[in-house]
Regions:
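Active-site hotspot residues in diverse enzymes, especially metal/ion-binding acidic/histidine motifs
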Residues: 1-148
Length: 148
């Protein structure tokens, strides 16, 4: 998806904002201090990702990528129409799929393997390359069979 929309820098970092806007999406920050992350789709090419006030920019990037996963996998792919809402925080197959989508989108395999070699498996340094949390980088590395 990221390659199709030409969102990657030379290092492999995804320009999530570019993808979001090209798809007709937008982000709103909740006025509630501890509101949960969610996606509201009004129709194809018209959706809103809701993020709380108190999360880090790296968490927000993963949330946006996660909600894009719902948009592609659970709205566009099954050819849904009309309004639909997806909430984050549940433990089910759709949430797992959205997390995997986000991980692949933010840390594409080839670029991730290059960064892993360049940084000797240092998850903190690899996380910096992709602007994700060290734990997200470590999980991606484990899935790819890479070690620190």
């Amino acid at each position: 998806m990221g390659k199709h929309h030409n969102i990657y820098s030379m290092s492999g970092r995804a320009d999530i904002d570019k993808l979001l806007h090209s798809l007709g999406g937008r982000v709103t920050v909740s006025h509630e201090l501890f509101d949960r992350e969610a996606l509201t789709v009004y129709g194809p090419g018209n959706f809103e990702i809701h993020i709380p006030q108190v999360t880090s920019s790296r968490r927000d990037r993963f949330t946006i990528a996660h909600e894009l996963g719902h948009y592609f996998l659970h709205y566009l792919h099954p050819e849904e129409t009309g309004m639909r809402t997806f909430g984050r925080g549940q433990r089910n197959w759709a949430e797992t799929q959205a997390n995997v989508f986000a991980s692949h989108l933010l840390m594409p395999e080839d670029a991730f393997r290059r960064a892993h070699r360049a940084h000797g498996g240092d998850w903190w340094a690899i996380a910096e390359v992709f602007n994700v949390s060290p734990s997200a980088a470590e999980v991606r590395g484990q899935v790819l069979g890479l070690r620190s």
